[in-house]
């Protein structure tokens, strides 16, 4: 009889090991006295997801319409074939996560401390920043934080609203894709002489990919720098910055799109960067589109559409600011290279101590409301003047049929397959300048999320 009674338990454990378990959390109608194993018996607290021993293939489902406050830390690991997944279920608004105080896990709502973890279809909001003091904590602030050593994680299809930092990742082989981030205007910390943040996505290490995200309104207007923050920042000099791929993102209203620091990190490490691809992004931001301080080796900016004519209340207004400190000169083949980009600018396409020597190939330059202004660069450029876009003032960056951008870009099909809208790029022949290739058919659905 005892042997027979153990058989169902053995089968349950075997089945769980093979296919993984499903757990359910409902903050409105659940109870922590339940087993959490069915939709009818959900837990109430999201802390149960931390206390249970998750195994490869397990899925934690959070009920739509639920709201959770405070931090949870997922320390277990999945596998490549059986990742552990945090997701939503039911109908209504995405389940909401916040952490209003830095005294609890530095203000993180969810911390990933294992490998092969997926976070999807969740909503993060109102994590702290404005009243934070001290520089050490800034290396940990974020609504969703991936710890160093937590590799092969995926963050997809989530919302981050008014989070001082949306996503901070110190894990390698991370994919951050198709998230919607709409930021605050307050700094993560502030003194009389300095401030820092806010940022949408903060990468602490290399071997990461950021793609198909919408990132909006991360930046201050009143910091000692004039403004600070931005869509994506790559720093924390403790770890290498090799192999980063940032592509097919839409950014708007941020204090810049990308910043890579040098000697500003805490602690003050100096970290050179290697093998980046920043391609097919559409960026309508204030401040500088690119603020590059770190020395570059094999860094490529390809087929981006950069509209830098609205300051969004911020004073700095160059497209690419290259103030590299130390390391190899940018203008060497081992440095930074701009190819096939559309620069729409109000002051200058490039600025900084190394900008004149940066490698530039087949870019188009258009000074806002001054279509006759000619770019006084070298003959390797595609040209300058009115790009003939469908409606620049309404942020419609599609090319008109008579656009001079058509057929002026070099073919990079050995590196890229799809334009900003996911349409196939020609395998042979010249491409069009910018992130959006000319097409008579409008895409049925944007790949970058809207809200």
Which role does the model predict for each range below?
Residues 27-63, 67-68, 73, 403, ...:
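Acidic Gly/Asp/Thr-rich repetitive segments characteristic of extracellular carbohydrate-active
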Residues 61-63, 77-137, 383-387:
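Right-handed parallel beta-helix/beta-spiral solenoid domain characteristic of secreted/periplasmic
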Residues 379-440:
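C-terminal accessory segments
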Residues 99-111, 132-147, 161-165, 189-205, ...:
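Extracellular beta-strand/beta-solenoid scaffold signature
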Residues 55, 63, 76, 81, ...:
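Parallel beta-helix/beta-solenoid
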Residues 70, 75, 105, 248-251, ...:
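Predominantly extracellular beta-rich ligand-binding scaffolds that present long acidic/polar faces
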Residues 70, 105, 122-128, 139, ...:
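Surface-exposed loop/turn segments connecting beta-strands in extracellular beta-rich domains
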